[in-house]
Amino acid sequence: MAATSLTAPPSFSGLRRISPKLDAAAVSSHQSFFHRVNSSTRLVSSSSSSHRSPRGVVAMAGSGKFFVGGNWKCNGTKDSIAKLISDLNSATLEADVDVVVSPPFVYIDQVKSSLTDRIDISGQNSWVGKGGAFTGEISVEQLKDLGCKWVILGHSERRHVIGEKDEFIGKKAAYALSEGLGVIACIGEKLEEREAGKTFDVCFAQLKAFADAVPSWDNIVVAYEPVWAIGTGKVASPQQAQEVHVAVRGWLKKNVSEEVASKTRIIYGGSVNGGNSAELAKEEDIDGFLVGGASLKGPEFATIVNSVTSKKVAA
């Protein structure tokens, strides 16, 4: 289904009606949060400004490189994945982007052995502790053994189809981090929660579960994926996505630290494709994407990676 922009969710134009648990100060100030953070958070990458691209710098609220992950989910065969790898290997990708793909577990070794080193590998899930008698699960140690550097945790399909709870997901993140994997920490609300004005409450509760469990945010990327936009063809407008990203950054500042808020990359997912990624990328607090279906098409995924160019401003 072709993606269409959802500029106003049905019967509700905002994100919140009545939600006592959300700090009032955070609500009133979240839209101006970016203007209060230190200008040093506007970076090309972790390198010094003397190495900036002559085309300009990347203006984004999270420090580090633009981040694009491809979640292949439960898709593919050996042959189709070989074709996808070939397309990715031949693609021209912007240098100032961290690129990660997440194949089904059974194909990770195939991907790792033939995919360009330019692209890192992620698991789609991991167990909450050391491996053992846990039928059907995948351990962090196994992912590392196959060369993975990241793992996706808290994806809505794990939360709402498999039934994983916030606290359990937080513990999984803590274990993965303790063993040296980076975590793509997913949060996001369902349509009925957005319509009820609970977007912030839901996202903040999911964030809190991560914050309560993890020892550090140094190797975490937060992925905001509104459930109503995943695989539906509906896409949050750039303004809708930006509003939530700013609120998430504000929550991190208030509840974790200003340093974590300024450093953490917050990426968007939910029917991102080659046609809408450039407009989404222009928003200052959208630090990249977590891509589903479009990541199964090599040329389109490359277009999404290269949408970082729309984020560049004159130095």
Swiss-Prot record:
Pathway: Carbohydrate biosynthesis; Calvin cycle
Pfam family, one: TIM
Source domain of life: Eukaryota
Annotated keywords: Calvin cycle, Chloroplast, Isomerase, Phosphoprotein, Plastid, Transit peptide
Catalytic reactions of this protein: D-glyceraldehyde 3-phosphate = dihydroxyacetone phosphate
GO molecular function: triose-phosphate isomerase activity
Active site: H155, E225
Subcellular location: Plastid, Chloroplast
Enzyme Commission no: 5.3.1.1
Transit peptide: 1-60
Binding site for substrate: N71, K73
GO biological process: chloroplast organization; glyceraldehyde-3-phosphate biosynthetic process; glycerol catabolic process; glycolytic process; primary root development; reductive pentose-phosphate cycle; triglyceride mobilization
A GO cellular component entry from the record: mitochondrion
Keyword Isomerase part of the UniProt annotation: yes
Chain positions with Phosphoserine modification: S178
Family (UniProt): Belongs to the triosephosphate isomerase family.
Cross-referenced PANTHER family: TRIOSEPHOSPHATE ISOMERASE (PTHR21139:SF2)
Subunit and interaction comment: Homodimer.
Other notes: In plants, there are two types of TPIS, cytosolic and plastid.
Protein name: Triosephosphate isomerase, chloroplastic
Lineage: Eukaryota, Viridiplantae, Streptophyta, Embryophyta, Tracheophyta
Gene: TIM
